[in-house]
Amino acid sequence: MAKKKSPGTLAENRKARHDYNIEDTIEAGIVLQGTEIKSIRRGSANLKDSYAQVKNGEMYLNNMHIAPYEEGNRFNHDPLRSRKLLLHKREIFKLGEQTREIGYSIVPLKLYLKHGHCKVLLGVARGKKKYDKRQALKEKAVKRDVARDMKARY
């Protein structure tokens, strides 16, 4: 059974935790248009296959799909446009340095509201190999079996 989202969580990238080893996380604000935030609050955002990258000293989130707002008529947004992330220069520089190493990328893990503002939890990640994924699934199954046995004892 899937975990329930916390009240502020609007979208989660569960596939990222399966495909990547997350080494570091950082919170960033995101620049949105009016119809985008309305659509996000309805739960119409998808973080799958999205990534962040540094362009000209600024951080952008690419491939995040936000469905068009139904009541948005002609003022609706482009669902897959690049969205600017709000970070300090030193944070952008640090993330840029980490991603210059081969095999590292920045993936969004969660989209949530904090004090009425939309935030993105970014993770500096290294891709897992197929055997790493299998090993992680085996460890998860063992933990589940142990927990089930402990529960049955008491």
From Swiss-Prot:
One of its GO terms (cellular component) is cytosol. This is SsrA-binding protein. Its main location: cytoplasm. The keyword Hydrolase does not apply. InterPro entries: SmpB (IPR023620), SsrA-bd_prot (IPR000037), SsrA-bd_prot_CS (IPR020081). It holds the Pfam family SmpB. SUPFAM superfamilies: Small protein B (SmpB) (SSF74982). Keywords: Cytoplasm, RNA-binding. GO terms for biological process: trans-translation. It comes from Staphylococcus aureus (strain JH9). GO terms for molecular function: RNA binding. Belongs to the SmpB family. It is found in: Cytoplasm. Coiled coil: none annotated. Required for rescue of stalled ribosomes mediated by trans-translation. Binds to transfer-messenger RNA (tmRNA), required for stable association of tmRNA with ribosomes. tmRNA and SmpB together mimic tRNA shape, replacing the anticodon stem-loop with SmpB. tmRNA is encoded by the ssrA gene; the 2 termini fold to resemble tRNA(Ala) and it encodes a 'tag peptide', a short internal open reading frame. During trans-translation Ala-aminoacylated tmRNA acts like a tRNA, entering the A-site of stalled ribosomes, displacing the stalled mRNA.
